[in-house]
């Protein structure tokens, strides 16, 4: 069988392995706030999102994706880490809430980071203020990840898996159709080599037609010969039959001209030139 189906199957398996590798989970990003998570009203705050090298877009989400902000201004924080910064110049009471990060590294989006809660309070100006000192970085607040919000992601991981299954299914169907086509071609080639089953019968039919024509002409010539007997010959035959004893004698008239011309008439029926009549009688005894 042709090696093409085997090569195509190997190509499909390699493609499936590549897609499966791309489907591996990306590391979760991290989020932090500078100068801290408790910010006086009117002050500034910067959210820092970090992820692996090769991130194309970082997204800062607030309150379970109800509000988000994307940025492609990604810098490399270390040889194995990249980051993006989201700054709020003047914090208001409406800025308080839960924040988390997510990043896009082709061809998929990562999981969400842990939640970070930002608190906004009125500035008291006292030395014992519980505000976070400038320059400090507060860690994220641990909250259970809400997987129900994944439906809003621009690129769904479930769709990627469905695409992989569809690709594998289409490849299997294509290989099956290709196999059927190869089998059909082989079967057709064998039929061409053997020839059609009725070709021999059809070749014999034209050869039988001249034989049938010759038989018809022979029967017609025999009838004409018998009918051409003169009345005297017929009477002689009748008297000979009556005078015979226990044996019966039958006379047969042989027309040499008719016998010699049968084949010629079958080949060229237009030749009607009369020839000398030659008749021979033969006595046949019937017991």
Curated annotation (Swiss-Prot):
Residues 187-287 are cytoplasmic. It comes from the Eukaryota. A motif (ITIM motif 2) lies at residues 279-284. SMART domains: IG. GO terms for biological process: adaptive immune response; immune response-regulating signaling pathway. It is a single-pass type I membrane protein. Phosphorylation at Tyr-251 and Tyr-281 activates it. May be phosphorylated by LCK. Disulfide bonds join 49-101. Interacts with SH2 domains of tyrosine-protein phosphatases PTPN6 and PTPN11. The interaction with PTPN6 is constitutive. Interacts with the SH2 domain of CSK. Binds with high affinity to extracellular matrix collagens, the interaction is functionally important. This is Leukocyte-associated immunoglobulin-like receptor 1. It comes from Homo sapiens (Human).
């Amino acid at each position: 069988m042709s090696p093409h189906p085997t090569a195509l199957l190997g190509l499909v398996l390699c493609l499936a392995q590549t897609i499966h590798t791309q489907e591996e989970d990306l590391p979760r990003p991290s989020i932090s706030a500078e100068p801290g998570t408790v910010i006086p009203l009117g002050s500034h705050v910067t959210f820092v999102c970090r992820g692996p090298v090769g991130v194309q877009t970082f997204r800062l989400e607030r309150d379970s994706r109800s509000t988000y902000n994307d940025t492609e201004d990604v810098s490399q924080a270390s040889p194995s880490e990249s980051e993006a910064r989201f700054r709020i110049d003047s914090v208001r009471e409406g800025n308080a809430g839960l924040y988390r990060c997510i990043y896009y590294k082709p061809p998929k989006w990562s999981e969400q980071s842990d939640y970070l809660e930002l608190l906004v309070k009125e500035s008291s100006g006292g030395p014992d203020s519980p505000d976070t000192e400038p320059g400090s970085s507060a860690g994220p607040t641990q909250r259970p990840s809400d997987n129900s919000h994944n439906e809003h992601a621009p690129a769904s991981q479930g769709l990627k898996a469905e695409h992989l299954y569809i690709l594998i299914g289409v490849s299997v169907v294509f290989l099956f159709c290709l196999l059927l086509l190869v089998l059909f071609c082989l079967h057709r080639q064998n039929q061409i080599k053997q020839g059609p089953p009725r070709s021999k019968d059809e070749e014999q039919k034209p050869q039988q037609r001249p034989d049938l024509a010759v038989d018809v002409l022979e029967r017609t010539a025999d009838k004409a010969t018998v009918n051409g007997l003169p009345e005297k010959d017929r009477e002689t035959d009748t008297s000979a039959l009556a005078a015979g004893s226990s044996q019966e004698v039958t006379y047969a008239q042989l027309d040499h001209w008719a016998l010699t011309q049968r084949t010629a008439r079958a080949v060229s029926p237009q030749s009607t030139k009369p020839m000398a009549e030659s008749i021979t009688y033969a006595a046949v005894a019937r017991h």
